[in-house]
Amino acid sequence: MDYTVVWLAAGISFLVTLVLGPVTIPLLQRLKFGQTIRAEGPAAHMAKTGTPTMGGIMFLIGIAVAGAVLLVSNIPGRAEGLVVLAVTLGYGLIGFLDDFIKVVLKRNLGLKAREKILGQLVFATVLAVVAVFKLGRGTDYIIPFSSGISFDLGWWPFFFLTLFVLLGTSNGVNLTDGLDGLASGATVFTATAFAILALVTGKIGLAIVLAAVVGGCLGFLFYNRHPAKVFMGDTGSLALGGALGAGAVVTRNELLLVVIGGLYVLETLSVIIQVISFKTTGRRVFRMSPLHHHFELSGWSERKVVRNFWLLSFLFSLVGLLGAQDFWLWLSNR
């Protein structure tokens, strides 16, 4: 099978994102779309105040262009690719509205929690319905690290689990996006793992979209690595989470997402544990949550935290990939 088109998708998204940087970043600066830094955060972060945000629009355009160019033909997995692309852009739109309200309308909290969750639920519902009734995905789940053992939950449990997967992943990536290059770099590994799973199951169209996510994140890293010239904002983090969650649902690897996206799980758990501990005992388990801030306040430099968390994301993705039955079936047929 010729995978050239998948590499091309990553390349197009990478180049579009890279080219948009010198145009988008000065525009965001002129519009004064600057990031507000929490006073209770690490003191070193105060220097980031005013750094342009909403930069996620750069790689969203790159992903959309790659998808528009390469998903026109009737390739295997085209429908799956279009669905994941739609969810990615939909979640990006929710993030954009949230950023716009915070940065432009100066409403610090952005969209109300119920408004943001409602928007995410709408796209998650569409994904669940389309996956089962249009893509023939079924309502069964493959148990990771097994010989392909699966179990069928039926429609309603599948529906609610899909909602949970999309909301959990998008907000997990959002929580991870707290250091220069952390979320964009970690997503390179996570999205690569799901792109490989799409390829080995013959879903080239889906692999194209996920490869475009990888390319867009790599292009964005040129401007987002420390010291960051731009932040992705909720525009980018919610979109990336939507892409990963939707990719997991379409490839029937929702359970494996817990492993492949293990870094996001750790970041989210650190927040949950911190809140529960403080409310029940008045004590904090971590110096600060999410987890990356704990290591910063423990004396690690921002670069060191990011490098180690990238490595952790790579290892989670590798272990998760090795736990996928589809991957081993593909290897055995080579």
Curated annotation (Swiss-Prot):
The organism's taxonomic lineage, starting at the top: Bacteria, Bacillati, Bacillota, Clostridia, Eubacteriales
Function (record text): Catalyzes the initial step of the lipid cycle reactions in the biosynthesis of the cell wall peptidoglycan: transfers peptidoglycan precursor phospho-MurNAc-pentapeptide from UDP-MurNAc-pentapeptide onto the lipid carrier undecaprenyl phosphate, yielding undecaprenyl-pyrophosphoryl-MurNAc-pentapeptide, known as lipid I.
Gene Ontology cellular component list: plasma membrane
Keywords from the named record: Cell cycle, Cell division, Cell membrane, Cell shape, Cell wall biogenesis/degradation, Magnesium, Membrane, Metal-binding, Peptidoglycan synthesis, Transferase, Transmembrane, Transmembrane helix
A matching Pfam family: Glycos_transf_4
Gene Ontology biological process: cell division; cell wall organization; peptidoglycan biosynthetic process; regulation of cell shape
Gene source species: Desulforamulus reducens (strain ATCC BAA-1160 / DSM 100696 / MI-1) (Desulfotomaculum reducens)
Compartments, record wording: Cell membrane
Keyword set includes Lipoprotein: no
Reaction(s) this enzyme catalyzes, per UniProt: UDP-N-acetyl-alpha-D-muramoyl-L-alanyl-gamma-D-glutamyl-meso-2,6-diaminopimeloyl-D-alanyl-D-alanine + di-trans,octa-cis-undecaprenyl phosphate = di-trans,octa-cis-undecaprenyl diphospho-N-acetyl-alpha-D-muramoyl-L-alanyl-D-glutamyl-meso-2,6-diaminopimeloyl-D-alanyl-D-alanine + UMP
Main location: membrane
NCBIfam families xrefs: mraY (TIGR00445)
Family from the record: Belongs to the glycosyltransferase 4 family. MraY subfamily.
Identification of the protein by name: Phospho-N-acetylmuramoyl-pentapeptide-transferase
Enzyme class: transferase
Pathway connected to this protein: Cell wall biogenesis; peptidoglycan biosynthesis
